[in-house]
C-alpha cells in the first residue's frame, strides 16, 4: 500500500492515457517483478486505459530489444506498448518552461499527452544530484539533449552543493 497517496487503482480511475516511466538498461531495476504489479493496479482502476511504458534513457544509447526482454520478460514486451526515449529526436520533444537555472525544459511529448504519469525506480544517493529517483526519471530521463546538457553542465556539477545527499541549494536538484 502506498504511503501518503491513494493506491494506483484509485489514481488511474477515469484516466485514459497513462504513462509509466521506467529506468533503462544502465540501472538495476527488477521490472520483471514490479511492472506486472503496477500494470495490474492501473487496470483495476481503469481496465481500458491506454498504457505506454516509456524507457527513460536520458542521453544513454537506446535500450535494445534483448535488454527489454531481459528487463520486462517476453509477456510484457509482447503485450504492452513500450517506447524507448530518444533525447536526440527534437520532433518528439515539447517545450514546457524555463527552469530556475534559466535553461529550457523540453520533455518527451508522451508525458504531456498523458492523463497520469507513474515513475518506477529506485531512490538512492547520487553523486551530484543529491539523490536519484522519481524526479530523475523526468530530468534527465525523458528530456531533450539540450535540457540534459544544461542540467549536467560543468558549471552546475562544479557547485560545492552538487554532491551526494544534498538537495537544498543543489543547482542540479533544483532544476529537477
Annotated model-derived regions:
Residues 17-28, 52-58:
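Short glycine-rich or small-residue beta-strand-to-loop segments that form or flank ligand, phosphate
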Residues 3-19, 43-49:
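Glycine-rich phosphate/diphosphate-binding loops that line cofactor/substrate pockets in enzymes
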Residues 14-17, 47-51, 77-79, 112-116, ...:
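Short coil/turn connectors at secondary-structure junctions
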Residues 41, 127-148:
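A short, gly/pro- and small-residue-rich
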Residues 138-176:
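Extended, low-polarity segments enriched in aliphatic/aromatic residues
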Residues 27-47:
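Histidine-anchored nucleotide/phosphate-binding helix
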Residues 63-132:
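An acidic, phosphate/nucleotide-engaging active-site surface
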Residues 3-6, 37-40, 100-110, 174:
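Short alpha-helical segments and helix-capping/turn motifs at coil-helix boundaries
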Amino acid at each position: 500500500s502506498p504511503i501518503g497517496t491513494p493506491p494506483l487503482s484509485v489514481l488511474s480511475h477515469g484516466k485514459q492515457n497513462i504513462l509509466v516511466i521506467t529506468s533503462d538498461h544502465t540501472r538495476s531495476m527488477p521490472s520483471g517483478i514490479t511492472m506486472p504489479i503496477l500494470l495490474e493496479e492501473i487496470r483495476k482502476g481503469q481496465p481500458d486505459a491506454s498504457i505506454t511504458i516509456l524507457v527513460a534513457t536520458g542521453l544513454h544509447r537506446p535500450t535494445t530489444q534483448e535488454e527489454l526482454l531481459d528487463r520486462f520478460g517476453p509477456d510484457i514486451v509482447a503485450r504492452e506498448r513500450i517506447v524507448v526515449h530518444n533525447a536526440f529526436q527534437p520532433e518528439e520533444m515539447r517545450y514546457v518552461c524555463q527552469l530556475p537555472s534559466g535553461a529550457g525544459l523540453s520533455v518527451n511529448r508522451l508525458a504531456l499527452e498523458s492523463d497520469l504519469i507513474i515513475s518506477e525506480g529506485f531512490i538512492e544517493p547520487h553523486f551530484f544530484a543529491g539523490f536519484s529517483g522519481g524526479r530523475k526519471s523526468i530530468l534527465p530521463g525523458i528530456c531533450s539533449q539540450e535540457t540534459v546538457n544544461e542540467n549536467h553542465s560543468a558549471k552546475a556539477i562544479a557547485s560545492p552543493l552538487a554532491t551526494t545527499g544534498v538537495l537544498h541549494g543543489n543547482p542540479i536538484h533544483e532544476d529537477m
